Each structure stands twice: as C-alpha cells, then as structure tokens.
C-alpha cells in the first residue's frame, strides 16, 4: 500500500467526511431494528425510534458500524465510515487541537490507542505519535463501503445528488497534481 498514491489531501478528506457523515445521513428516519453498541452490548436505540440529531451524534460517536432504517419499500442498511469525535472518548481533553486533532478520527486506531495506554498523559502522547493514522489522508476500507452504500441508497431518498456544474465544485489544480 502506497499512501501517496491514494492521498486525498485535506480537501478530499473534508469531502468524504462531509458527504459520508453517518449522523447527517440517518437524521429524520425511523430505525427498523434495535441499535446495539458493539463494544458494550448496550442497546443505544430501539426499533421504531425516530432518529434525532442528538441520537444520531450518539450513534456515530459510539462507532456503530451500521443501522437499519425504514425505507418506503424496504429496510435500508446505512453503513458508517467509523469516524468519531475524539472528545467522546477523552472527555477530559479540553482542546483536541493541542494534540493536532482538527477533525473526526478513525475509530479502529483510536480504540487501539485507548486499549494500549492507561493514563491520560500516555494516551495524549500516543495520539500525537499516531496522528497520521488517526486522521487518515487516504481512503479507508470503510470509506469505500460507505461510498458505495451512499450511492446505492440515493434512489431511496437517502442523501442527495451533487450538482457537478455548481461553481463550488471547481478548484484550482496545483502544478504536478
């Protein structure tokens, strides 16, 4: 794997996070099955629950890999890209920017850091050391699956089409890009 070949730079990661934001994709829909936290086994939300913004944030930050929601014709499985807010796992962290965290972090790497380090100071050092893995600049497997999932469910009214002719979708390309 060559990370430079699949480098998204800052703009690409921003677009992935914006488009595949798990919580924005499920707000306003009804769950068709219970949502269970994979780490604790706790039921986070029961079936027939209307997903509010607060519940959607909770589900995303709990690193739930998917939820089932009710569509007009059938159940729809919405996949997560497993990007979470670090403050959910380190509530004593006042300013994530002091560690170099400026956006959502990749949960599998964060989980490994939390398991291997016991004290807050050790965890902060590990986060600084592994910041490039926590905030990947390349496409992850979960990104690919969530992208395919997003595109498949456009026909069911989940998500929205991009206007490719919109001037906001233009950018200047640097030399050598």
Residue ranges and their predicted role:
Residues 1-177:
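N-terminal non-catalytic structural scaffold regions of very large proteins
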């Amino acid at each position: 794997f060559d990370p430079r070949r699949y480098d998204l730079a800052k703009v690409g990661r921003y677009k992935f996070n914006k488009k595949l934001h798990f919580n924005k994709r499920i707000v306003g829909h009804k769950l068709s099955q219970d949502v269970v936290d994979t780490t604790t086994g706790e039921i986070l939300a029961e079936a027939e629950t209307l997903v509010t913004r607060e519940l959607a944030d909770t589900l995303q930050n709990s690193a739930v890999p998917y939820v089932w929601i009710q569509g007009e014709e059938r159940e729809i499985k919405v996949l997560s890209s497993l990007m979470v807010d670090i403050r959910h796992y380190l509530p004593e962290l006042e300013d994530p920017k002091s560690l170099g965290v400026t956006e959502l972090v990749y949960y599998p790497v964060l989980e490994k850091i939390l398991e291997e380090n016991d004290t807050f100071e050790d965890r902060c050092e590990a986060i600084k050391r592994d910041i490039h893995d926590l905030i990947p600049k390349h496409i992850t497997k979960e990104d690919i699956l969530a992208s395919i999932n997003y595109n498949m469910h456009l026909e069911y009214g989940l998500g929205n089409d991009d206007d490719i002719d919109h001037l906001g979708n233009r950018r200047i390309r640097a030399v050598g890009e």
